[in-house]
From Swiss-Prot:
CDD domains (UniProt xref): DHOD_2_like (cd04738)
Protein name: Dihydroorotate dehydrogenase (quinone)
Any GO CC annotation of this UniProt entry: cytoplasm
Source taxonomy: Bacteria, Pseudomonadati, Pseudomonadota, Betaproteobacteria, Burkholderiales
Location in or out of the cell: Cell membrane
Short name of one Pfam family: DHO_dh
Binding, substrate: K69, N114, R115, L116, G117, F118, N182, N187, N256, T257
GO terms of biological process kind: 'de novo' pyrimidine nucleobase biosynthetic process; 'de novo' UMP biosynthetic process
Encoding gene per record: pyrD
Organism: Polaromonas sp. (strain JS666 / ATCC BAA-500)
PROSITE patterns, per database record: DHODEHASE_1, DHODEHASE_2
C-alpha cells in the first residue's frame, strides 16, 4: 500500500483546476521517481501473470494512455504496481491541443470530460523520455510491459492520417513492447472516421505492411493494438473485428471516452464538449467488449478500459471478455490504491 494515502492529497488537488492538478501531479512524479520521496506512492506489484500477444504481463491491471502523454513518468508509474503502462498519445510533431479550459470534473458521477486534443511535445521528445526510463534499462525477471500510443497531428488532413501513423510507428517500434493505434479520440477532428469500414481497412493495411518491414529491420515483431470508441453499434463492432483479423492486428483496446451524456444529464459541466470518462462509461465499454469477444472468438487479446473505479469494476471487464484492464480516471478519483485493489480482485475472482 502507499505510505501516503491519496485521501490526504485529493482535497488539495480537487481544489485546483483539473488540468493544473494534473500538471502538478505529473511534475511531482517526474521529479521524485527513483528517489526516496517516491516511497509516498510506491506499492508492491500483485503477482498474477498472463501471456498475451506474445508478451508476459506481471499482472492484469495497466495504466491507460493519456495520463502521461510525454512519457516523463514511466518509472514513477511503474512503482505504483501496474503490470503494464501505456503512454502517449504521441503525434509526429508537438502540438498544444485545444484551447483551455479543456478538462472538467463531474465528481457526483466519478467522471471527467476532456477535450485536450492530443497535446504533446512530439515524437522526438517522447522517444528521448522513453529511453531515459530506468525500468526500460533494468534486466529483471518480470519487466514492466510498456505500450506506446500513437496518433495524428490536428493539422494533418484526415486523408493523409496514415502518414502520421507510419511516422510514429517507425519511431516507436524499436522501443515499444506493444503499439496502440489511437483512432478513437473524439477531440481530434474527423479522427473517428478512421473506424469506418473502408478507411480502417486502408489504414490497417498500410500499418500491417510497415510492421512487416520494421520486423525485418529490427529483428522482432512488435504487437499492434487498435483503440476504438464505445459509441459503436453492433454492426460497426463486427466490421472492426473482421478488419482487425484480416490485417493480423494483435489486439484491441476497448474503449476510449464517450460522447454520450445520458448518464450525466443535469450535472455541472455535463454539456461541455469532449469525451466523457469514468464511472458512466463502464457499461458502454463492457457492452463493446462483449460484442468484440463474440465477434473475435476466444484467444484474440482485448484490453478493457473505461469506468474502472473499483476492484469489482475491473472484474466486470474480465467477465465481459477482456484479458487485462486499464485505468485512468479511476486513478484520479481513487488514487494509486486502486491499482492493487483491481489486480487483487481480478486474481481472486477469475
Amino acid at each position: 500500500m502507499s505510505l501516503l494515502p491519496y485521501a490526504l492529497a485529493r482535497p488539495f488537488l480537487f481544489g485546483l483546476d483539473p488540468e493544473t492538478a494534473h500538471e502538478l501531479t505529473m511534475a511531482s512524479l517526474a521529479r521524485t521517481q527513483g528517489t526516496p520521496l517516491s516511497l509516498a506512492w510506491c506499492s508492491s506489484r500483485v503477482n498474477d501473470p498472463i501471456a498475451l500477444a506474445g508478451l508476459k504481463f506481471a499482472n492484469r491491471v495497466g495504466l491507460a494512455a493519456g495520463l502521461d502523454k510525454n512519457a516523463r513518468c514511466i518509472d514513477g508509474l511503474a512503482a505504483m504496481g501496474f503490470g503494464f503502462v501505456e503512454v502517449g498519445t504521441v503525434t509526429p510533431k508537438g502540438q498544444p491541443g485545444n484551447p483551455k479550459p479543456r478538462m472538467f470534473r463531474l465528481p457526483e458521477a466519478n467522471a471527467l470530460i476532456n477535450r485536450l486534443g492530443f497535446n504533446n511535445d512530439g515524437l522526438d521528445a517522447f522517444l528521448a523520455n522513453v529511453q531515459q526510463s530506468r525500468v526500460r534499462r533494468q534486466n529483471t525477471p518480470n519487466p514492466l510491459i510498456l505500450g506506446l500510443n500513437i496518433g495524428k497531428n490536428a493539422v494533418t488532413p484526415i486523408e493523409n492520417a496514415v502518414d502520421d501513423y507510419l511516422t510514429c510507428l517507425d519511431g516507436v517500434y524499436p522501443h515499444a513492447d506493444y503499439v496502440t493505434v489511437n483512432i478513437s479520440s473524439p477531440n481530434t477532428k474527423n479522427l473517428r472516421a478512421l473506424q469506418s469500414d473502408e478507411a480502417l481497412d486502408a489504414l490497417l493495411g498500410r500499418i500491417a505492411e510497415r510492421r512487416e518491414s520494421l520486423a525485418r529491420q529490427h529483428g522482432k515483431r512488435v504487437p499492434i493494438f487498435v483503440k476504438i470508441a464505445p459509441d459503436l453499434d453492433e454492426a460497426q463492432v463486427d466490421v472492426i473485428a473482421a478488419t482487425l483479423k484480416r490485417h493480423a492486428m494483435d489486439g484491441v483496446v476497448a474503449t476510449n471516452t464517450t460522447l454520450s451524456r445520458d448518464a450525466v444529464k443535469g450535472l455541472r459541466h455535463a454539456e461541455e464538449a469532449g469525451g466523457l470518462s469514468g464511472a458512466p462509461v463502464l457499461e458502454a465499454s463492457n457492452r463493446v467488449i462483449r460484442q468484440l469477444r463474440a465477434a473475435l472468438g476466444a484467444g484474440f487479446p482485448i484490453i478493457g478500459v473505461g469506468g474502472v473505479m473499483s476492484g469489482q469494476d475491473a472484474v466486470s471487464k474480465i467477465r465481459a471478455g477482456a484479458d487485462v484492464v486499464q485505468i485512468y480516471t479511476g486513478l484520479i478519483y481513487k488514487g494509486p490504491e486502486l491499482v492493487n485493489e483491481a489486480a487483487l480482485a481480478i486474481k481472486k475472482n477469475r
